[in-house]
Amino acid sequence: MTDADFAEQLKDLDTTLRNIESVLDIDRLRADKARLEEAASAPDLWDDQARAQQVTSQLSYVNGEITKLTDLRSRLDDTQVLLELAEAESDPGVLTEVAAEITGLAKSIDEMEVRTLLSGEYDSREALVAIRAGAGGVDAADFAEMLLRMYLRWAERHGYPTEVYETSYAEEAGLKSATFTVKVPYAYGTLSVESGTHRLVRISPFDNQGRRQTSFAGVEVLPVVEQTDHIDIPENEMRTDVYRSSGPGGQSVNTTDSAVRITHIPTGIVVTCQNEKSQLQNKASALRVLQARLLERKRQEEQAKLQGLKTDAAGSWGDQMRSYVLHPYQMVKDLRTEQETGSPSSVFDGELDAFIEAGIRWRKQQQLSGDNV
């Protein structure tokens, strides 16, 4: 590849990065940083713990975005200088270094560009993720627990704070269901492409005959409700039941009735929370989950009205979107984007970025196709 080719590649990368800087508005991010730093330094910040956690979480996220953008700009400028040096000295060794830098830059800028595709009404929200075991008995419950760990590890890899609201354990092993939040801006826009039915194929560790088992689990991603959403639920529309928290195998893990189940009478939606020690805390968490489900229901109804379709609130649960095959071969494959890997262990350890980024791009293409119909 010639010097001119490298120069053209760098020019294209510079154009892409300038577009990203414009869309993400780095000047606004810097202004947000100053505002959040001022809020974080307030002496009474921790008088309201929920507010304090929100401020520190947002500040961490904004700092991360600014660092990514400034690092990319610095790397691009340094590579341009390196290319000029290679041209001046006619040094093939330096050109090899330039080629490697351009390859790395292209990958990093491509990953950052995905953020510019998150422009939906609720994409900037924090995310509430619900996982439910589906068909497959104990293997499905075990799969649900594997998915919970996978998403928590993904968040941990990125330094995103999470909070587990509810884990309902199955009798033999695994989880019937789990609900948690990812507390950073744009978590909903990022993770919403994970909604759907996930499928696991493996030799069951719970089958004495060592037979292959197919099991399913559903993932539902909702935007966290904010005050501006005005999701107010009258007390007479809710039935609240309390019970003792249970752990693996159905054993009781609390001597008081601290777990809470809320039923929304008009819709039949049921939410539970048992991870907090206090009944009041569990009720508050369960109410947040219920509000998120009602907001999603409202969003689906509005979308269906625009499209002239009948709302199917459970539709996403029936959409099989990814297979995890551990036997007779090893592969994870997204059925929408064709993204795949031969390393299921790394995926279950939270290496999801390639799948999520492909999902976001696929969703954007679907939206554009729909607009053109």
Swiss-Prot record:
Keywords: Cytoplasm, Methylation, Protein biosynthesis. Gene3D superfamilies: 3.30.160.20, 3.30.70.1660, Release factor. The keyword Protein biosynthesis applies. InterPro entries: PCRF, Pep_chain_release_fac_I, Pep_chain_release_fac_I_sf, PrfB. Methylated by PrmC. Methylation increases the termination efficiency of RF2. This is Peptide chain release factor 2. Pfam families: PCRF, RF-1. The gene is prfB. Peptide chain release factor 2 directs the termination of translation in response to the peptide chain termination codons UGA and UAA. It comes from the Bacteria. Belongs to the prokaryotic/mitochondrial release factor family. Its main location: cytoplasm. It is found in: Cytoplasm. The modification N5-methylglutamine is found at residue 251. One of its GO terms (molecular function) is translation release factor activity, codon specific. GO terms for cellular component: cytoplasm. It comes from Salinispora arenicola (strain CNS-205).
